[in-house]
């Protein structure tokens, strides 16, 4: 018996150990792989956005679809957008700086290029390069001029920059056309001849004038003010009226008055409904009482008619009895009169008798 008990204990311990191992394996398989999920040292699942511990991996989809998680994500996105988008004033300041420094860099680069061109032409320049260079440089200058006008806002400086660029382009084209008689290798692809960012301008394009930019800045400032007023929590200020004014909410007294009026309105509605129900019940009760009274009157009329019928039958029976009694009495009276007259006739004299006969 002792051996059997030990075997059972051993089997239970093995089963428990196997169940725990199975649970661990299932937990390890169900680990959440998400940038918003994180596991601590104890292996508990945490939400990075909400900073909340999730009890189980099965609850992770429900937590992601929850209202609190979505609000936190939206707040983070809004703050990130506000941080990543600099003000237009800073952009214009950088643009003005770049505008002053770019012509100098371009002039230095062009001077260096003209000095190194006699050696480079022997190996790199293909046939027809000068025509393509002139057309591409003219197009690039024509595309760059309006962008500089929009970015800077100073039209006189833009005209000077355009004039310098056109003069530099003409000088470069004339200097390149002189050694055109040198034998050149076969033409190569345009990707080898031009740099990768030749047609791209690193300066951001502005699609509106300065006045429109100022209006956009003012709108953004107003929106941010509204967002800050809405973001303030309830009770941020000690004075409840000031707190309600900043948060653009009704004051506590006004709110209490509104709630009291709503309460009174609801009470009146409930009272009107209850009065209507009571009136309906009273009307139904009155109709029921009238119906009962009518039924009772009908029953009383039936009883009266029945009693009348009984009275008539009794009267008829009484009349018959009286008639029978009167007829009997009359007959008795007639018989008694005959008996009395007979002896008187017998005792009369014969004369009278004969005369009588």
UniProtKB/Swiss-Prot annotation:
Keywords of the record: Cell cycle, Cell division, Chromosome, Coiled coil, Developmental protein, Metal-binding, Mitosis, Nucleus, Zinc, Zinc-finger
Coiled-coil region list: 279-325
Any one GO molecular-function label of the UniProt entry: zinc ion binding
Biased composition (Basic and acidic residues): 99-115, 242-255
Region ranges (Disordered): 98-126, 157-194, 231-255
Any one cellular-component term (Gene Ontology): chromosome
Biased composition (Acidic residues): 157-168
InterPro entries cross-referenced by the UniProt entry: Matrin/U1-like-C_Znf_C2H2 (IPR003604), ZNF830-like (IPR040050), Znf_C2H2_jaz (IPR022755), Znf_C2H2_sf (IPR036236)
Record-linked Gene3D superfamilies: Classic Zinc Finger
Predominant subcellular localization, coarse grouping: nucleus
Localization terms from the record: Nucleus; Chromosome; Nucleus speckle
Disulfide pattern: none
GO biological process: cell division
C2H2-type zinc-finger residues: 47-69
Role, per record: May act as an important regulator of the cell cycle that participates in the maintenance of genome integrity.
Name this protein carries in UniProt: Zinc finger protein 830
Species whose genome carries this gene: Xenopus tropicalis
């Amino acid at each position: 018996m002792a051996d059997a008990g030990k075997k059972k204990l051993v089997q239970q311990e093995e089963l428990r150990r196997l169940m725990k191992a199975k649970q661990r394996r299932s937990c390890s398989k169900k680990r959440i792989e998400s940038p918003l999920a994180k596991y601590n040292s104890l292996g508990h699942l945490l939400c990075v956005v909400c900073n909340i511990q999730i009890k189980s991996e099965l609850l992770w989809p429900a937590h992601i679809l929850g209202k609190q998680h979505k609000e936190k994500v939206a707040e983070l996105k809004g703050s990130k957008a506000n941080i990543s988008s600099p003000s237009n004033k800073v952009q214009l300041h950088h643009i003005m700086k770049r505008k002053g420094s770019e012509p100098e860099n371009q002039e230095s680069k062009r001077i260096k290029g003209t000095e190194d061109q006699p050696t480079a032409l022997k190996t790199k320049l293909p046939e027809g390069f000068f025509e393509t260079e002139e057309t591409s440089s003219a197009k690039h200058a024509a595309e760059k001029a309006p962008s500089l006008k929009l970015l800077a806002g100073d039209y006189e400086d833009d005209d000077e920059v355009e004039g310098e660029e056109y003069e530099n382009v003409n000088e470069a084209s004339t200097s390149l056309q002189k050694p055109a008689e040198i034998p050149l290798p076969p033409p190569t692809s345009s990707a080898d001849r031009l740099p990768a960012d030749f047609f791209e301008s690193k300066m951001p394009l502005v699609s509106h004038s300065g006045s429109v930019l100022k209006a956009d800045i003012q709108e953004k400032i107003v929106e941010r003010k509204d967002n800050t007023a809405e973001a303030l929590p309830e009770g941020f200020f000690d004075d409840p009226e000031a707190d309600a004014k900043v948060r653009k909410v009704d004051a506590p007294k006004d709110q209490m008055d509104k709630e009291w009026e709503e309460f009174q309105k609801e009470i009146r509605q409930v009272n009107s409904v209850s009065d209507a129900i009571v009136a309906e019940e009273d009307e139904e009760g009155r109709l029921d009482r009238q119906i009962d009274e009518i039924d009772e009157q009908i029953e009383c009329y039936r009883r009266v008619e029945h009693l009348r019928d009984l009275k008539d039958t009794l009267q008829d029976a009484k009349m018959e009895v009286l008639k029978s009694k009167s007829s009997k009495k009359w007959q008795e009276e007639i018989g008694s009169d005959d008996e009395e007259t007979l002896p008187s006739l017998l005792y009369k004299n014969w004369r009278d008798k004969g005369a009588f006969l």
